[in-house]
Amino acid sequence: MYPIKRNRRLRSNESIRSLVRETILSPNDFLVPLFVVEGKGIKDEIPSMPNYFRFSLDTLEAEVKLLWSLGLKSVLVFVKVADALKDNKGTEALNSNGLMQRAVKTIKNVCPEMLVMTDVALDPY
């Protein structure tokens, strides 16, 4: 005989349901990739990635402010290192005035609380 009462202890009230639910995504869960290039006034869409752009440092400022205002608090920075600066050891990654270092400084100047992650991206070397 099938039971008349179904004991759903994990669904008995909202507090328990919210505790055991599988997934909830919020802006805090997202990491936004930022692609940075040398130059001024650059915001070029990446053809293979619709709605993603390459930013110069000056246009990066506005993007970081926008992301923060939307509640997005983490970014992952990728830079396009000029071919002339590439070598077998990836020494540009250690340049204190390199594009990556300047990009991180720009982001932190605009939004000190932004979580910034970087990718040295040695694969193009």
Task: Place the predicted regions along the sequence by residue.
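N-terminal small/glycine-rich loop or linker at the start of catalytic domains
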Residues: 25-52, 117-125
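Generic structural signal for well-ordered, non-membrane alpha-helical segments
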Residues: 9-13, 27, 53, 57, ...
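Alpha-helix-loop-beta-strand connector modules within alpha/beta enzyme cores
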Residues: 86-120
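Glycine-rich, proline-tolerant flexible connector loops at the mouths of alpha/beta enzymes
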Residues: 43-55, 72-98, 125
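N-terminal amphipathic/basic leader segments beginning at the initiator methionine
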Residues: 1-21
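Non-catalytic positions within long, well-ordered alpha-helices that form the structural scaffold/packing
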Residues: 65-68
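Short, well-ordered coil/turn segments that N-cap beta-strands
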Residues: 27-30, 70-74, 111-114
